[in-house]
Amino acid sequence: MSETTLNDIPQLRRGFRFQWEPAQNCHVLLYPEGMVKLNDSAAAILGQVDGDRSIAAIVAALRERFPESDGIEEDVLEFLEVARERSWIELH
């Protein structure tokens, strides 16, 4: 498996849906076998994943939204690599 890069374009895998879940009071990733509760950082990243934007564009959007945060690029790359390993997303 190749390394995740800023040029990759992530998208949720078929059957997965990202949404706010009032009963859980957090964003979740729903899929046929269950649900993953997401922390705020994971939700901010997955909220940018639309199948059209590159990881570089996602990083830029998050830097604009959270200018005080350091290490956004590394955090995004690390999280999306984990998401890919868990088969939540595909990279193109």
Curated annotation (Swiss-Prot):
GO terms for biological process: pyrroloquinoline quinone biosynthetic process. Pathway: Cofactor biosynthesis; pyrroloquinoline quinone biosynthesis. Signal peptide: none annotated. Keywords: PQQ biosynthesis. InterPro entries: PQQD, PqqD_bac, PqqD_sf. It comes from the Bacteria. One of its GO terms (molecular function) is quinone binding. Functions as a PqqA binding protein and presents PqqA to PqqE, in the pyrroloquinoline quinone (PQQ) biosynthetic pathway. Monomer. Interacts with PqqE. NCBIfam families: PQQ_PqqD, PRK02079.1. Belongs to the PqqD family. This is PqqA binding protein.
